[in-house]
């Protein structure tokens, strides 16, 4: 089940995961907008390190936006939560600590609908906590897919094409590409190739 109809007396956790460029944030915004149409009070949070498009808004790669509050730690949600809030949205969940798991469950136990979007694996193809644990405890998990830049197949992995070997590197098209299993090469210095030319060479 990808999306629940809201029941006012119950809370739950929804998780939206996938590679970069798979539409995770767009899906998060869509669900939050639907909640607004239903006249439910929403609050949206994002990690303060995510300043790629707009520091004060959750923004998808196609520049769809929704106002948000940047925070350092998920624990800050408790001090910022408004009494009439019914739906909490959290983007880039992988950039928060493991305490996000318990906070999400505590919010749901209070009757709130919690929607969290984030990467389920990092640039090395390894589980990107806390998202895998959130997937395990959530009532609903949606796995989004991008399009592989090499062959056009559904892409479930994020290829880093530039910058350091740390797990966290905030970036967009300048540092990452979506890849399928076959074309995923988790080397930090993997170059961005002319894939159209490469495919033509393979065919000829």
Swiss-Prot record:
Active site residues per record: 92
A biological process term (GO) from this entry: thymidine metabolic process
Catalyzed reactions: thymidine + ATP = dTMP + ADP + H(+)
Protein's cellular compartments: Cytoplasm
Enzyme class, broadest EC rank: transferase
Pfam families hit by this protein: TK
Keyword Hydrolase: no
Binding site for Zn(2+): 148, 151, 180, 183
Residue positions binding ATP: 18-25, 91-94
PROSITE patterns, alphabetized: TK_CELLULAR_TYPE
Molecular function per GO: ATP binding; thymidine kinase activity; zinc ion binding
Subunit and interaction comment: Homotetramer.
NCBIfam families: PRK04296.1-1
Family affiliation: Belongs to the thymidine kinase family.
Stated name of the protein: Thymidine kinase
Native species: Bdellovibrio bacteriovorus (strain ATCC 15356 / DSM 50701 / NCIMB 9529 / HD100)
């Amino acid at each position: 089940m990808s999306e629940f109809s809201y029941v006012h007396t119950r809370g739950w956790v929804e998780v939206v995961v996938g590679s970069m460029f798979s539409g995770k944030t767009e899906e998060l915004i869509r669900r939050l907008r639907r909640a607004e149409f239903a006249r439910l009070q929403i609050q949206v949070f994002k990690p303060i390190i995510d300043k790629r498009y707009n520091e004060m808004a959750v923004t998808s790669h196609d520049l769809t936006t929704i106002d948000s509050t940047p925070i350092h730690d998920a624990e800050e949600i408790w001090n910022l939560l408004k009494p009439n809030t019914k739906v909490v949205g959290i983007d880039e969940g992988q950039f928060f600590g493991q305490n996000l798991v318990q906070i999400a469950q505590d919010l749901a136990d209070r009757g709130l609908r919690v929607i969290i979007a984030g990467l389920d694996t990092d640039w090395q193809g390894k589980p990107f906590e806390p998202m895998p644990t959130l997937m395990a405890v959530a009532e609903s998990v949606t796995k989004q897919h991008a399009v592989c830049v090499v062959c056009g197949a559904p892409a479930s992995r994020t290829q880093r094409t530039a910058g350091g070997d740390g797990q966290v590197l905030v970036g967009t098209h300048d540092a990452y590409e979506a890849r399928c299993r076959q074309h995923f090469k988790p080397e930090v210095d993997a170059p961005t190739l002319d894939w159209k030319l490469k495919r033509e060479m393979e065919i000829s």
